[in-house]
Curated annotation (Swiss-Prot):
GO terms for cellular component: membrane; polyphosphate kinase complex. Catalyzes the reversible transfer of the terminal phosphate of ATP to form a long-chain polyphosphate (polyP). It comes from Vibrio cholerae serotype O1 (strain ATCC 39315 / El Tor Inaba N16961). InterPro entries: PLipase_D/transphosphatidylase, PP_kinase, PP_kinase_C_1, PP_kinase_middle, PP_kinase_middle_dom_sf, PPK_C_dom2, PPK_N_dom, PPK_N_dom_sf. Residues 428-462, 585-615 form the PLD phosphodiesterase domain. The gene is ppk. This is Polyphosphate kinase. Keywords: ATP-binding, Kinase, Magnesium, Metal-binding, Nucleotide-binding, Phosphoprotein, Repeat, Transferase. The lineage of its organism: Bacteria, Pseudomonadati, Pseudomonadota, Gammaproteobacteria, Vibrionales.
Length: 701
């Protein structure tokens, strides 16, 4: 097989991942409302794809054109467009199918032409009272630069006013930042039906009431449209500008960045479409996509369940971790033994409670934390402010370049700085993606450090839907190295050595290679050798080549890859010892885990880093060993449960076919539910053991 056939283009692999999301919307075993929400997730993902992946390839084409390079990127862009258009068609078909399915459940999503007289009267009243104050049309005159005000990823209604042979055009922003997108119509007596109308359709219904009295026209029509801009921005690195100022300017650039996608209602007249493309400076490298009458489907992530409970997933309430029970405070519990939390199965309240306790504990001297993404109304962040008020030294490393969270992080930076928190904006040229917390307490004559090392963000909301591991430890070797990471962030030019943590960009590549090479050596020596890897994305060619080498040497490799995967499994003599699955279900799989067999003494690591060049070589990431045998086995058990999933697991192959793992006649295993049950049993057994220990202690007194 030629070398180029050993790597799948990451952009095409990403589209294959989003196809797996669309499979969830198509799966009739998924509750109906959840299927509709998966349409929203698919749409949100695709928006980001165009902002980032598509825009990056388009940028490469323009660079190659200037430099006289080859047209490889053009070919890739064409394949991306073809695949995206196919997925959009599948999406439209699924949407129509689900609308009919909802109607069978007596839930009706109606447009403005389907209202009866009573509903029509109510909707018009709602429009005048709630909607009209938020509607201001923008007339598209010849002298107006649409690019200066058209918002990225907002849905608009493009209005055509015709008077004889003359046309005027206008744009109306659908004000979903001010009003709900889904409006529930009042129930009518004697009718057991729920009726929902989109805000878009309320505006369509009342177009005449917006323009009447200001413009003369014979006909008035509205068509849906949306534009996606390039999400990249250039930062000025002049000395006189702080990173905060640079980022603020960068966000302003994004607001007026060039378009990469224009989605329009397919019934839009040709003359109107040409006019809009001219005004929006749409090039032939951009994606022009005809669609239905609704855009910004990402709002469907929050589609309301107005029907029966069974139309949604059964709740899986987060459980409390028994390792914290029986102690006066969280620090005593962590000092007694390492604690592993697994969100969303465990409650994130354990983390917010730890920081809350630290904020007023008289023994706590300092708190250090790095923030990548946090909730808008974060209790954890408010506790950091409380800690400063209580005289603690608080250092917060804020990553201002967390994509699409930049604005929120800038705002939190200002709030924290105003409160007296020492805010650091990180290392120039490198994102800080590690998930670290360090709390220092004065216990007697000693300073004792407590560390958190995780795979996911300190984000209360996403911790309810993202699966992640969080290690809490009072191991002073690990805690000292977490402290060293913060020192490296504050002074990246000072030499630092890590003996226990694996830290990007210092030693991640060499240490991961060392771990994989050890398995290769064991396989060549005739010993059992195995690697288990779980990441979101695997696209780094150096790491892929090392895995190919391990497979060729006889190392058995199992992988769970949620998103992009450039490695091609099943190639004879190259990757025939590699098995890859991907799991898409109600929770988003987010942990990064590496397990090496190590000649029968497994080594287990959790990490913040995906296996991408940027994460390994150009970001600050932390990979931590799990020392506690009990916790090592727990992680291995959880991974093993995922590898026997017969409901939500798909095989990753070179054709990107997304075939479900063969189900056969075996008992169905849905791994996320099985993991919940497994952890529930772990907590039950822990409480039972604690109760037995308490009984023994009482009887010995």
């Amino acid at each position: 097989m030629s070398a180029d056939k050993l790597y799948i283009d990451k952009e095409l692999s990403w589209l294959s991942f989003n196809e797996r999301v669309l499979q969830e919307a198509a799966d009739k075993t998924v509750p109906l409302i959840e299927r509709i929400r998966f349409l929203g997730i698919f749409s949100n993902n695709l928006d980001e794809f165009y902002k980032v992946r598509f825009a990056d390839v388009k940028r490469q084409i323009l660079i190659n054109r200037e430099r006289g390079g080859n047209d490889i990127s053009k070919h890739l862009l064409s394949r991306m467009q073809s695949k995206a258009l196919k997925l959009n068609q599948d999406f439209d078909n699924l949407y129509n199918e689900l609308i009919l399915e909802m109607a069978r459940r007596r839930i009706f999503l109606v447009n403005e032409t389907q209202l009866d007289e009573i509903q029509l009267k109510w909707v018009k009243k709602y429009f005048h009272k709630e909607v009209l104050p938020h509607v201001t049309p923008i007339m598209l005159r010849d002298d107006i630069d649409v690019m200066q005000f058209l918002k990225d990823e907002y849905a608009y209604i493009a209005v055509e006013m015709r008077s004889g042979d003359e046309f005027k055009y206008a744009l109306i922003e659908i004000p979903t930042d001010q009003l709900p997108r889904f409006v529930m119509l009042p129930e009518q007596k004697g009718k057991r039906r729920k009726t929902i109308i989109l805000l878009d359709n309320i505006i369509r219904l009342c177009l005449d009431e917006i323009f009447r009295g200001f413009y003369d026209y014979d006909t008035l029509n509205g068509y849906a449209m949306k534009m996606t801009r390039d999400a990249e921005y250039d930062l000025r690195h002049e000395v006189e500008y702080s990173l905060l100022e640079q980022m603020s300017e960068g966000l302003s650039q994004r607001l007026t960045a060039l378009p990469v996608r224009f989605v329009y209602e397919r019934e839009m007249p040709e003359a109107m479409l040409k006019f809009l493309c001219y005004k929006l400076k749409i090039s032939h490298y951009d994606s022009l996509i005809p669609g239905g009458r609704y855009h910004n489907f990402k709002d469907f992530i929050s589609f309301p369940n107005v029907g029966r409970d069974y139309l949604e997933n059964k709740p899986l309430p987060p459980m409390t971790c028994a390792d914290f029970e029986g102690y006066a405070n969280a620090f005593d519990a962590i000092r007694a033994q390492d604690i592993l939390l697994h969100y969303p199965y465990h409650s994130f309240e354990h983390m917010t409670e730890l920081v809350r306790q630290a904020s007023f504990d008289p023994k706590v001297v300092s708190i250090k934390i790095n923030i990548y993404r946090v909730a808008k109304d974060s209790k954890l962040m408010n506790s950091l402010v409380d800690a400063v008020h209580n005289g603690k030294r608080v250092v917060v490393v804020v990553e201002l370049q967390a994509r699409f969270d930049e604005e929120a992080n800038i705002e939190w930076s200002r709030i924290l700085t105003d409160a007296g928190v020492h805010v650091i904006f990180g290392v120039p040229g490198m994102k800080i993606h590690a998930k670290l917390l360090l709390i220092t307490r004065k216990e007697g004559d000693e300073f004792v450090r407590y560390a958190h090392i995780g795979t996911g963000n300190f984000h209360e909301r996403t911790a309810r839907i993202y699966t992640d591991f969080a290690l809490l430890t009072a191991n002073q070797e690990l805690a000292a190295e977490v402290r060293a990471v913060f020192g490296y962030i504050e002074n990246p030019f000072r030499p630092v050595k890590f003996n226990h943590l694996i830290v990007s960009p210092r030693n991640s590549r060499t240490q991961i290679y060392r771990l994989l090479d050890s398995e290769i050596a064991n396989a060549k020596a005739g010993k059992k050798a195995a690697i288990t890897l779980k990441v979101n994305n695997l696209v780094d060619k150096g790491l892929i080549n090392k895995l190919y080498g391990a497979s060729a040497a006889g190392v058995k490799i199992r992988m769970i890859i949620r998103g992009m995967c450039s490695l091609v499994p099943g190639v004879e003599g190259v990757s025939d010892n590699i098995e890859i699955i991907s799991i898409i279900d109600r929770f988003l799989e987010h942990p990064r885990v590496l397990v090496v067999h190590n000649d029968g003494n497994p080594q287990v690591f959790i990490s913040s880093a995906d296996w991408m060049e940027r994460n390994i070589d150009h970001r600050i990431e932390v990979m931590a060993p799990i020392r506690d045998e009990r916790l090592k086995q727990r992680i291995i058990d959880i991974l093993n449960i995922q590898f026997i999933d017969t409901v939500k697991a798909r095989r990753i192959d070179k054709e990107m076919s997304n075939q479900y793992v063969e189900r056969g006649n075996r008992r169905k295993v849905r791994s996320q539910i099985a993991i919940y049950d497994y952890l529930k049993n772990v907590e039950k057994q822990t409480r039972k053991a604690k109760g037995q220990q308490e009984t023994n202690d009482n009887s010995s007194q």
